[in-house]
Amino acid sequence: MDNLSNYLIVSAVLFSIGTIGVLTRKNAIVVFMCIELMLNAVNLTFVAFSRHLGNLDGQIFVFFIMTVAAAEAAVGLALFIAFFNNRESIDIDDANLMKW
């Protein structure tokens, strides 16, 4: 049986875990993984609504989100590598020193 509320609860829990991780962690890679977890929670919501409503619009939109997330991962990891080569650390507090 397809119960929409179960999928939405799981999605909300995943999004909450990702939000807590972004707000509390100081390691840039862990924060990046939490952002990806939040994006996957949104994808789960889109797929759940798409299946519940019986159309494919939500599933097509998920493919666009996954494409943007892949580009974000490539650019984000490249920035982390450049930052690590500069500062020898991937701590979020050290990134604050990059301001003018």
Swiss-Prot record:
Gene Ontology, cellular component aspect: NADH dehydrogenase complex; plasma membrane
Catalytic activity: a quinone + NADH + 5 H(+)(in) = a quinol + NAD(+) + 4 H(+)(out)
Stored InterPro entries: NADH_UbQ_OxRdtase_chain4L/K, NUOK/Mnh_C1-like
Pfam family, one: Oxidored_q2
ATP-binding as UniProt keyword: no
Coiled coil: none
GO BP term, example: ATP synthesis coupled electron transport
GO molecular function: NADH:ubiquinone reductase (non-electrogenic) activity; quinone binding
Broad class of the protein's primary localization: membrane
Membrane topology: Multi-pass membrane protein
The EC number(s) this enzyme carries: 7.1.1.-
Transmembrane segments: 4-24, 29-49, 60-80
Keyword Cell inner membrane tagged: yes
Compartment(s): Cell inner membrane
Alphabetized UniProt keyword annotations: Cell inner membrane, Cell membrane, Membrane, NAD, Quinone, Translocase, Transmembrane, Transmembrane helix, Transport, Ubiquinone
Domain of life: Bacteria
Stated role: NDH-1 shuttles electrons from NADH, via FMN and iron-sulfur (Fe-S) centers, to quinones in the respiratory chain. The immediate electron acceptor for the enzyme in this species is believed to be ubiquinone. Couples the redox reaction to proton translocation (for every two electrons transferred, four hydrogen ions are translocated across the cytoplasmic membrane), and thus conserves the redox energy in a proton gradient.
Subunit organization: NDH-1 is composed of 14 different subunits. Subunits NuoA, H, J, K, L, M, N constitute the membrane sector of the complex.
NCBIfam families: PRK05715.1-2, PRK05715.1-3, PRK05715.1-5
Entry's family note: Belongs to the complex I subunit 4L family.
Protein name: NADH-quinone oxidoreductase subunit K
Species per Swiss-Prot/TrEMBL record: Trichlorobacter lovleyi (strain ATCC BAA-1151 / DSM 17278 / SZ)
